[in-house]
């Protein structure tokens, strides 16, 4: 899509999602008291406390989230995706999350910067009425792929399919994304509840 851009040579890419899968998540946002969930402003304020500025831009169904250091003004990472209407309702598709390679040496890198970027995306999906989120953790390196899968499991995603290229059913995945990996889904409301203590204001 037109929104996809490469940061610079010193970057690392986290996920790519599969756009053609049907959400199997049944929990709906309206069953949860919205006051118990972290708001977008609370996520933004929590990021500022870590010296990170997050910016959300939207264009039709597409969105882009950029993370910038408040200390250096350098871009630390970026996420892109879209809101898609599917048979089961609206679904949040995370096209990619990219982090600068230099951030990997920071304690707050994947489980910090990546988590903040992901939280903005998930909250945005919730506000747009999405019930679930989908992605594909690309397997272009066994070591890095295992880190990706652990990261997504830690924040609340579940494995639904391994795209290995060994079956005809994997062909569509590989044609769209150009590689193999692990398909993962998550319930958006459950993600926000899981992250509640990290982002929700005490009062």
Residue ranges of model-derived segments:
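Non-catalytic substrate-recognition and accessory regions of acyl/acetyltransferase enzymes
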Residues: 2-112, 116-138, 145-165, 169-203
